[in-house]
Amino acid sequence: MKQYNVIAIMLDSLRQDHLGCYGNTRVRTPNIDQLARESVIFDNAYPEGLPTIPVRTALFTGQRTLPYRPWQPLEKEDITAAEIFSALGYTCALITDTYHLAKPGMNFHKGFHSFDWIRGQEGDPYITAPHGKDLEDYIKPAMYGDRVVGLIDQYLRNTAGRKGEEDYFCARVMRKAMDWIENNAKVNQPFFLWVDSFDPHEPWDPPSRYDTYTDPNYSGKKLIHPKYGPVDWITQEELEYVRGLYAGEVTFVDTWTGHFLDKIRELGLMENTLIVLLADHGHPHGDHGSIMKTDNNLYSELLRIPLMIRHPEGLYAGKHVHPLVETDDVLPTILDILGLGHETISMHGKSAWRLVTGEASKLRDVVITGYHESRHRCVRDEEWSYISRPDPEDDELYHLTEDPKEKVNVIDRYPEKAEELRRHLGVYFRPRLPRILSIQLRYEVQHTPAGK
């Protein structure tokens, strides 16, 4: 076992195609790009179950959630990364403003020695005092009656006391993380730190100095949190404004992630700390006719995530790994690098480090992803993406190598490829057949929710 510290940096809703290290030339992300140059970069990383909570469940446990588990708390039987590291003598801490993790009963603090929740993101019911702003400045008539109006109102209440950049959420998360490692680096004990920033998740409200991607002449509504669904209610000018806000949020997050990474370097921790940076999913911005996360928008802007792993010894720095990787592979990969592969035997996920070293050429033939409650599913290999739709909607097939933006549905030209990928759904979503040890157990399995 190698006694490396482990730091995971989760940046919620960060689109892979908005990072320079993945080919973007418009959005400025110098700090994450620098980390990428020191890391192994995974080009085809995907969440297997969406969105926020199922992804964290897979990351924290190494267990697949789709089609087994919906958005739900961690269960007491779940063995979490923090519990594993705690048993190995690590000090474990979670620092987050992702309020879904911290709601009472969600149990995502399980196994951590300390748990710091920065309150106030999005619709977190935190501040009740009025915000003093005109809510009409932030919504259009098409948004009346939509739940996002309440989220915006709560967010404005939560942020009414902000004075400067350091009061914005990602800055507060990273400052807490910097304080934590400064205090704990002095202790002769390895640590596991999970830093979970809800930004660049909506609302998109970056500090003014990062708002450089929007049209300076824009005078419309401040659409920091659009409603979910088709883009037919929003003008092209407004859509470009929203995209600009998101880009500014990404650069803001990159800046404060950079401050945190600088603190790690300043403390001399780079040589004995494994660093993982990733997102849970991306975010649609009208790329395929809808905005925000919806269960039917199973395209790369939502599905493809950034994932990079920096080895303390600088091994394989700058290497790009193309084979398919899932979020349930992340914990097994970390444990494998630490020489703890035996701890992963009961996990669904597999170590992606074997792809890096050349011990394996692939971990799986396809990834299957979607929302637990939805009948829309996406099956992908390294070249193709097949989307299964419920009747009467038409299925879709995209040749990713020739059409990376998924604009041309070629299912009529390649029906055999669509059928090849579709068959994986039949295997993957076949009802589970529990091992029956006795008549009593057969009855109990059939009459309990876990056995249905």
How would you label these PLM feature ranges?
Residues 1-452:
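Catalytic domains that recognize anionic headgroups
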